[in-house]
Amino acid sequence: PVRPHVGVVMSQSITAPGAYDGIPETEYQSDALIGPPLARPMSYSSAKTILSHPARFAWERENRRPGKREFDMGSLVHALLLRSGDDRLHVVDAYNWRTKAAQESRDEAQEQGKIAVHRGMLRDAARVAAAARRDPRVTQILSDGRPEVSVYWVDEETGVTCRARIDWLNPTDVVDVKTVGSYSKADPKPFGRSAASFDYPMQAAVYTEGVERATGVRRGFATIAVELDPPHFVHVTRYPEWAVLAGEARWRRALAIYAEREKSGQWADEGITTTPVPEWYGYDEIDTPEIEV
C-alpha cells in the first residue's frame, strides 16, 4: 500500500514552505512567482547552471529552455515506472516520426511546452518500466511511499527559497530514477562516471536536506538506474558519503552565487577566463624534463 507520510501535505497549490503531494508537473516546472517568501526558488538543476555560467542561468530563468528529445523517453519511463502520470506528456497517434502529420503534431505539442511521444515510444517505455518493476529491489523500494512530492524550503544562511521534486518518497529514502541510454551504462563504474559528470551527488545532498527541512525526518538517498537498451538491466545504488559532502559544498557555493548576483542584479560574464584544456592534449608534442630517480 502507498500512503502519505508525516509532514507531506495533500494539495494542488503551494502556500508556504513544506512538502506537497499533488502539485502538477507543469505547475512545478513553471517557476512562477508564488508569493513571498517563495518567489524564484532555486533547484538542483538551476544550481548546476549557475555554477558553470550565471548569465545562462539568468537567461533560462526568463526564457523557456529548449527541450532535448533524448530526455522525452526518460520522462515517459519515469511516469510509467512510478505510475505517477505527467501532465506534460502528449501522445501522438503514430508509431514513429516519419509522417508529416506526426511531425506536425509533435512540433505543435512542443511549442506548447509539452513532451511529445509516439505510440512506439510508449510501447518501448512500458517494456523498460515492466523490467524495472520485476527487480525485487525496485519492488521493495516502491512498495510504500508517494511519487512526485514537491518540497519547498528557505535556506537559513542565504535566505534563498529552494525547491526539489522528489521522484519517490518512502519512510526511509528519497528515491531518484535515472534512465541510462546505452547497454551496460547502469553498471557501477560507468554510472559513477556519469554521476560525477552530471552532479548527481549534489542532487542527493539537496534533496535530502530539503526533505528533512520540510518533514523533520532525515532520510537516505537511493538511485534506481535502468537501461533503456534490452534487457533493461537495473542498478540500485547509493552515493558514498564523501561525494555527497562534496555535492553539498557545491550547492552551498551555488546558493551564495545566486544570492550575491540577485542582490547586485549583475549576471553578465566578467573578465577573461582560461579554457580548461585536458592535460592529455599535446602530451607527445611537448618536451618534458627528465626526472632523475
Question: For the regions a protein language model found, what residue spans apply to each?
Answer:
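Coil-to-beta-strand transition motifs
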Residues: G159-R163, N170-T172, R218, P230-H232
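Metal-dependent nuclease catalytic regions and adjoining charged, substrate-binding loops involved
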Residues: V9-Q12, P17-D21, S194-P201, V206-V293
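Hydrophobic/aromatic-lined pockets within catalytic cores
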Residues: L81-G85, D155, T179-S182, E212-G216, ...
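Metal-dependent nuclease catalytic cores that hydrolyze phosphodiester bonds in DNA/RNA
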Residues: R3-A164, I272
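Secondary-structure boundary elements
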Residues: R137-S143, N170-D176, V211-R219
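Short histidine-centered catalytic/ligand-binding loop motif
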Residues: R64-P66, Q110-V117, A186-F198, P240-W242
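A residue-level signal for conserved active-site and pocket-lining positions in enzyme catalytic cores
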Residues: V77-H78, W168, W251
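Conserved catalytic cores of phosphodiester-cleaving nucleases, focusing on short active-site segments
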Residues: A164-R193, Y207
